Amino acid sequence: MKNKVLGLGLGLAVVMSGSAVAAEGLDLAKASGCLACHAVEKKVVGPAWQDVAAKYKGDAAARDVLVSKVKAGGKGNWNEVTGGVPMPPYSPRVADADIEKLVDFILAL
């Protein structure tokens, strides 16, 4: 019985911490202006973040590639979605640590 309670508690902690990470990611996205062009589940101007996560799933270089893209901006990776509209650079307007948190949030979707 003790193991069941411990397992339930650990499972609940994982779910709650995942929710906290998701909430922090969305709050950071709102504060940084990301939601002007992106949404989690649907295309706005830029691709849906779920689509970004799916495209880069299993790619060991994904985090570095996306952090660089968010910092520097650019175009070309999602032309079929954006119609060629480039992503603006977010560095130095958004701190590097916050950009990394945003990318981690997106890749975890």
Segments predicted by a language model, with ranges:
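An amphipathic alpha-helix signature
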Residues: L26, G46, R63-K71, D96-V103, ...
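Bacterial N-terminal signal peptides that target proteins for export
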Residues: M1-L8
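Axial heme c-ligation environment in periplasmic c-type cytochrome domains
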Residues: V45-Y56, A72-D98
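Short sequence/structural segments immediately N-terminal
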Residues: A29-A31, E80
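The canonical Cys-X-X-Cys-His
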Residues: G33-V40, L102
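Sec/Tat signal peptide C-region and signal peptidase I cleavage site
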Residues: M16-A22
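Gly/Gly-Pro-rich "capping" loops immediately C-terminal to redox-active cysteine motifs
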Residues: K30, A39-K69
